[in-house]
């Protein structure tokens, strides 16, 4: 996957975290929702399109293969690890 996409959408996925830090929100903000939405904004629109295009280019298939959904879910999780790890660490530290 391309680094340019990550760098373009990284500030967009960090906006909820920046707002919490700016306004010093001490009440029970749904941090898990913010954590999931920041990962979803950054990764989901790109993951399935890129994987399907890569498979079609390399295998010369005309239609989507049966394993595309499982493969895109696996790559979605693998891409979410480096993006969501800082948010997850912040979420667990704030919870304790």
Swiss-Prot record:
Transmembrane spans: 73-93
GO annotations of cellular component type: plasma membrane
Keywords of the record: Bacteriocin immunity, Cell membrane, Membrane, Plasmid, Transmembrane, Transmembrane helix
InterPro entries assigned to the protein according to its UniProt record, in alphabetical order: Colicin-K_immunity (IPR035265)
Bilayer disposition of the protein: Single-pass membrane protein
One Pfam match: CKI
Location(s) in or outside the cell: Cell membrane
One GO biological process term: bacteriocin immunity
Record's function text: This protein is able to protect a cell, which harbors the plasmid ColK encoding colicin K, against colicin K.
Protein name as annotated: Colicin-K immunity protein
Organism: Escherichia coli
């Amino acid at each position: 996957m391309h680094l340019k996409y990550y760098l373009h959408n990284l500030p967009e996925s960090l906006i909820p975290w920046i707002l919490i830090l700016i306004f010093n929100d001490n009440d029970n903000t749904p941090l898990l929702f913010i954590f999931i939405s920041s990962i979803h904004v950054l990764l989901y629109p790109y993951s399935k399109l890129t994987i399907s295009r890569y498979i079609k280019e390399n295998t010369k298939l005309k239609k989507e293969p049966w394993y595309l959904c499982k493969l895109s879910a696996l790559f979605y999780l693998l891409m979410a690890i480096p993006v969501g790890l800082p948010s997850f660490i912040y979420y667990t530290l704030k919870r304790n």
